């Protein structure tokens, strides 16, 4: 067994009894002890309860019980998600002693599916940066090069996966916080559609908030393979518990089964965000292969530009972020705006 194996592979080994949940947990704890001092990805551990749950998972498997698709899998979650009984800080010093009384909804779903959540991974202050540092736990380093950042804000999540400290993670994303760390650390990350995964129990907002998601933050998995992302989404996606009577996540079967029957639209690029040659070549190769397989492939323009899309994003982002600013900060920003060039069109200034 290698700690670079995918979560899907490890789950199968657990089911085949090639390794026990207790053994797999200890392998990860040993790995954390060996390399985490240099990476600083895992910042909080819950070893005793994790060992108890791992033993229970093994006993259940021996009796033929099935806890779910993640039965016995040890994993960590971003320190933005409340985990009952474990310090959850959101990277904020004012929450350094916060111990939740209940799980965030994503943690509820993971544990209900059989996962063993044994620790938390580092975040920047309020998950608001593209690096990973806070005053409580310090800086997280990229496991491939300790002098480099893993990105942020789910930098601890991505670094832990890349470093062999956990096989699966759940981060959050508003402006790249899953995707950037996944890219920097060479792992897989997915930002799902808005509200596909419940975000209740994420910090911010403040601890204990039970309100529904009114931001543009989404929860998203990080892993070592695309199959693992699908596995995680099969557990995490769906309506909030308060909405389960209102809708369900059941899509109709696809209208076509053969590739030749599909029409595929390709948006090859946009001047606002030019592609690197290697990426453009890969898209063209994929387009050519689809056409060779009989699909009807057409280049299209969606009717809006990435510049328009970027402006809209920053308007939404600024509105969300500013709601949490103290009045003094808002007053200072207004003063800066008065002194700025009126011809500046950047939405981050407006």
Positions of PLM-derived features:
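An N-terminal boundary/leader segment
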Residues: 1-51, 292-294
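Short helix-loop capping/hinge segments that flank enzyme active sites or metal/cofactor-binding pockets
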Residues: 70-90, 258-267, 318-350
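Long amphipathic alpha-helix in the N-terminal Rossmann-like dinucleotide-binding domain
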Residues: 48-58, 114-115
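Acyltransferase
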Residues: 21-26, 55, 275-302, 325-337
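A short helix-breaking turn/cap at a secondary-structure junction
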Residues: 191-281, 285-287, 304, 331
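Short glycine/serine-rich loop segments
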Residues: 102-233
């Amino acid at each position: 067994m290698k700690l670079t194996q995918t979560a899907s592979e490890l789950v199968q080994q657990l089911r085949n009894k090639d390794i026990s949940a207790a053994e797999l947990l200890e392998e990860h704890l040993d790995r954390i002890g060996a390399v985490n001092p240099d990476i600083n990805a895992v910042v909080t551990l819950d070893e005793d309860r994790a060992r108890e749950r791992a033993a229970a998972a093994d006993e259940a498997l021996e009796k033929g019980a099935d806890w779910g698709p993640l039965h016995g899998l040890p994993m960590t979650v971003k320190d933005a998600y409340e985990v009952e009984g474990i310090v959850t800080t959101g990277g904020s010093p004012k929450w350094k002693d916060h111990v939740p009384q209940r799980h965030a909804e994503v943690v509820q779903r993971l544990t209900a599916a059989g996962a063993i959540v044994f620790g938390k991974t580092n975040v920047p202050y309020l998950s608001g940066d593209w690096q990973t540092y806070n005053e409580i736990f310090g800086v997280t380093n990229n496991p491939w090069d300790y002098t480099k950042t893993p990105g942020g804000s789910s930098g601890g999540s991505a670094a832990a996966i890349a470093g062999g400290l956990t096989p699966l993670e759940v981060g959050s994303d508003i402006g790249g916080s899953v995707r950037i760390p996944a890219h920097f650390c060479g792992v897989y990350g997915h930002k799902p559609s808005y509200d596909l995964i419940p975000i209740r129990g994420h910090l911010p907002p403040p601890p204990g908030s039970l309100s529904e998601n009114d931001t543009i933050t989404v929860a998203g998995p990080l892993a070592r393979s695309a199959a693992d992302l699908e596995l995680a989404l099969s557990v995490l996606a769906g309506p909030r518990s308060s909405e389960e009577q209102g809708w369900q996540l059941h899509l109709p079967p696809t209208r076509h089964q053969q590739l030749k029957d599909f029409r595929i639209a390709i948006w090859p690029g946009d001047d606002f965000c030019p592609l690197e040659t290697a990426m453009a070549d890969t898209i063209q190769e994929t387009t050519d292969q689809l056409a060779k397989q009989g699909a009807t492939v057409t280049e299209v323009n969606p009717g809006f530009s990435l510049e328009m899309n970027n402006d809209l994003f920053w308007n939404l982002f600024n509105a969300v972020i500013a709601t949490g600013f103290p009045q003094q900060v808002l007053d200072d920003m207004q003063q800066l705006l008065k002194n700025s060039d009126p011809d500046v069109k950047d939405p981050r200034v407006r």
